[in-house]
């Protein structure tokens, strides 16, 4: 099966058929983000790109002081995890699972990590990781919250069978109605 991703519109296709993303499923469960301010959203995207650049090359290029503080938090996390750079293999790859797709930020041997730069939303953040976990209880999941003061916080999320069932049900509804 061929999985394609179009960043314009955040659209996934499996063998040419449009399917919902993890983000769309989570938004259908918890509602859309209340009027997302484009500035923090763009900053979060840029910080993610810097983190991926750092994993890919072991270096970064930015003169944005505000974003650099978030990147410093990420660099501390990399150092404390003793990750040898460059480590492009850790950058998340697209997943396709029974009618939905997504791209986790970081995928290790047994852990999926999702980087967050905004306000912590525990239920929503956990549900997103449940989608990436795809029912595999052996995979550990963590949210890595990067803070603007150069610190970070890890929240480990446990597998939750009920949340997995809710996620699957919403994926089926979206696939049936094609409203995504």
Go through each PLM region and give its residues.
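Metal-dependent nuclease catalytic cores that hydrolyze phosphodiester bonds in DNA/RNA
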Residues: 1-101
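Nucleic-acid nuclease catalytic cores
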Residues: 93-180
